[in-house]
């Protein structure tokens, strides 16, 4: 049996797809090949995502490949997947999640707490920028885009004091040794689905059940809780929004942030994990009442 798995052309996207292929090979005797696709989001790098249509731009071209039956499945970073799936598509599995935290990589290994006043920090994320300003109002936030390596190189090229990147991506491309500091999830609430990979298929695909073996239940319901939170707030890359759900002893805890009326609101909620979707919705409702 041969499966074609679509993914973006970036090194990180290809590594993430290889992770899924390795998991598939361990579970089933399946030959897999990658179909590399340059998405609209990859082509337009000089403009911020919220001005050109959002993170869905990383997904749409890949879904077209599945519609045209050029690919059997796709691998995405769940933080790039819009909360509304197109008709006929589904996320069939979310394997065990990687580290969800954000990391700081600095020039000359200077710690975040030791940054000079007015330090220039690179990030294209509204969520990161807003939380950086809460931690250090004096910081100068510089918008940057590009793949992981490109953004790290911009520290010197654009005379930055540092950049903020997801720990998961750095680990997957073996660049985590460059990390200067890790942000706690309460001081820098992660993006919805950060650190998680999702396998997308057409609902009618005859072999889709093979991917279900890769599902990690607790990781999946945590991501689904975060996505319920985002859906209730109608959040996207135009929004300053983040959430992180975690589970301990069957109890789920979710922390979420959302910008409302020019104010960053942060709330937390706890409940049994079987109520994961209700918890995400309830947390959003608490924020809307603030």
Swiss-Prot record:
Modified-residue entries (S-(dipyrrolylmethanemethyl)cysteine), positions: 237
Pfam families in the cross-refs: Porphobil_deam, Porphobil_deamC
Catalysed conversion reaction: 4 porphobilinogen + H2O = hydroxymethylbilane + 4 NH4(+)
Keywords: Porphyrin biosynthesis, Transferase
GO terms of molecular function: hydroxymethylbilane synthase activity
GO cellular component: cytoplasm
UniProt pathway annotation: Porphyrin-containing compound metabolism; protoporphyrin-IX biosynthesis; coproporphyrinogen-III from 5-aminolevulinate: step 2/4
EC numbers for this chain: 2.5.1.61
SUPFAM superfamilies: Periplasmic binding protein-like II, Porphobilinogen deaminase (hydroxymethylbilane synthase), C-terminal domain
Cofactor: binding details: Binds 1 dipyrromethane group covalently.
Source superkingdom: Bacteria
More info: The porphobilinogen subunits are added to the dipyrromethane group.
Family as reported in the entry's similarity comment: Belongs to the HMBS family.
Purpose: Tetrapolymerization of the monopyrrole PBG into the hydroxymethylbilane pre-uroporphyrinogen in several discrete steps.
HAMAP family, per database record: Porphobil_deam
Protein name: Porphobilinogen deaminase
Taxonomic placement: Bacteria, Bacillati, Bacillota, Clostridia, Eubacteriales
Gene: hemC
């Amino acid at each position: 049996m041969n499966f074609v798995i679509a993914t973006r052309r970036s090194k990180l996207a290809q590594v993430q797809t290889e992770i899924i292929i390795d998991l598939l090979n361990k579970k089933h005797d399946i030959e897999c090949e990658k179909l590399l696709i340059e998405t609209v989001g990859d082509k337009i790098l000089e403009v911020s995502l919220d001005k050109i249509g959002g993170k869905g731009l990383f997904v749409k071209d890949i879904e077209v490949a599945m519609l045209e039956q050029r690919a059997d499945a796709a691998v995405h970073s769940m933080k790039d997947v819009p909360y509304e799936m197109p008709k006929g598509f589904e996320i069939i599995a979310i394997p065990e999640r990687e580290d969800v935290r954000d990391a700081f990589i600095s020039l000359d290994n200077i710690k975040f707490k030791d940054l000079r006043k007015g330090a220039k920090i690179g990030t294209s994320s509204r969520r990161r920028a807003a939380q950086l300003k809460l931690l250090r109002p004096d910081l100068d936030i510089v918008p940057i885009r590009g793949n992981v390596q490109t953004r790290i190189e911009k520290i010197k090229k654009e005379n930055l004091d540092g950049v903020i990147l997801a720990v998961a991506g750095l680990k997957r491309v073996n660049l985590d040794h460059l990390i200067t500091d890790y942000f706690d999830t309460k001081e820098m609430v992660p993006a919805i689905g950060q650190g998680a990979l999702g396998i997308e298929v057409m609902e009618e695909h005859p072999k889709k059940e093979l991917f279900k073996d890769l599902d990690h239940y607790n990781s999946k319901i945590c991501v689904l809780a975060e996505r319920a939170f985002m859906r209730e707030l109608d959040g996207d890359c135009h929004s300053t929004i983040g959430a992180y759900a975690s589970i301990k002893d069957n109890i789920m805890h979710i922390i979420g942030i959302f910008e409302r009326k020019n104010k960053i609101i942060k709330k937390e909620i706890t409940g049994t994990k079987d109520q994961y979707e209700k918890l995400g919705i309830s947390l959003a409702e608490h924020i809307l009442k603030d």
